[in-house]
């Protein structure tokens, strides 16, 4: 086919809906501003919390509740050393406490907090709460809820936690309508994808702060600090979002490339899920810009480009040179020039940091995702249907998560994202393969009907259905089991001893948490529903009163 003969009617257009935000984020007009006196108050509150945490060291349950509240309220990053010390103290007492106390709430809370911190404490502590083969003794609702939360830390082979998950979920669903607030809200959130382990930290904090306030026994200094800190970070995030929105608007990509998804706000929200803390501002900026590129690539390969054009673009990415520009169709020249410009900006940051080596890994990350997109385009062109194993090898690359994880390291501090960290991710260890499978399957499980509206390659659901001669419902159920298996593998890989420090591993864990939001019931990046809009508004528009 001559490139000049390619018409709009021959392109597999997806007709994505436009940006839902208009110019809402074009100007930074913070509803909350922190005065010098409030910054001083933050420091005073931090000192008060430190004192309280230290005083609680001799009271097991009190210390547990303090650590849990700090984490759930979203201020753990302010007390990393203190929490490390507190959890070491709790670990030393864990076995004896669980042996001497028949307290489901404290046992489950201890187990979850210690597992979250990487300590491989035994799940046998729950055996004494069993009631029959699959049942558990029902205690107060908070104890059952905490056991439900603890089950999200399970790994392969922990049958007691598999049984506890089913039991506690069913029990909480059965009594939810009879509960009153604030416990009703907490149960609702846990049952609807916002568990402590799998929820995005910023969403969790935003949801938990008002719940915590409703409990009469809340710690006043903690609550005040959590509100102040949330609003301060919200103002910072909105300022970052405004700068990125202006960058995106000035590029005029949705006008120049009208077939793409215009999702700058959703992209920023996605990447803030990787890291929300102030020290990761540069890393967020880089990741958002690269994910904007990846989104354009995805739409070009999936919903616009003719196969010969896509082959030219892949070759140009492989060669990575300005000399490739004239060989591309006009619309692809726009994309390729943007790639070079974004990477030139990244290079300038890396030179200042003395980490120029990271640029090679970032380029490699782009080549990986383009390779995945191209292989899928080739299958589509040849009307080839791969087997499940072959599909997953390619589709885990085209899910773009390996690319995003690699790029998430690029703007981090020098002593954290070492060459060894990049090489480790590229070697695809257990936690990476599990994360990539989770990303691919989560996407496929919610995107199948939309994809059927145009020429597409079969998804994991259809391939599994065909290979195993089962119904669509059975295939979906089995693939959901696969996503649970992936979470177990992620949990196991995060238990000590670990290969790399927490800041590296947290990027991978957080990348998985983002999937729980974007691929819950539908593909919320493609179809931005009201629930996602409300979440984004709570995080970037409305401060906590």
UniProtKB/Swiss-Prot annotation:
Gene Ontology BP term (one): sesquiterpene biosynthetic process
Molecular-function GO terms, alphabetical: germacrene-D synthase activity; magnesium ion binding; sesquiterpene synthase activity
Annotated Mg(2+) 1 binding sites: 298, 302
Binding positions (Mg(2+) 2): 298, 302
Organism classification: Eukaryota, Viridiplantae, Streptophyta, Embryophyta, Tracheophyta
Family under the similarity heading: Belongs to the terpene synthase family.
PANTHER family, sorted: ALPHA-HUMULENE_(-)-(E)-BETA-CARYOPHYLLENE SYNTHASE (PTHR31225:SF93), OS04G0344100 PROTEIN-RELATED (PTHR31225)
Localization in the cell: Cytoplasm, Cytosol
Described purpose of this protein according to its UniProt entry: Sesquiterpene synthase involved in germacrene D biosynthesis. Also produces at least 13 additional sesquiterpene products, including germacrene C and (+)-germacrene A, beta-ylangene, (E)-beta-farnesene and (E,E)-alpha-farnesene.
Protein name: Germacrene D synthase 1
Pathway linked to the protein: Secondary metabolite biosynthesis; terpenoid biosynthesis
Binding-site residues for Mg(2+) 3, renumbered to this chain: 443, 451
Primary enzyme class: lyase
Domain notes: The Asp-Asp-Xaa-Xaa-Asp/Glu (DDXXD/E) motif is important for the catalytic activity, presumably through binding to Mg(2+).
Motif, DDXXD motif: chain positions: 298-302
A single cellular component GO annotation: cytosol
Enzyme Commission numbers on file: 4.2.3.75
Keyword check for Mitochondrion: no
Catalytic activity: (2E,6E)-farnesyl diphosphate = (-)-germacrene D + diphosphate
Keywords linked to the UniProt accession: Cytoplasm, Lyase, Magnesium, Metal-binding
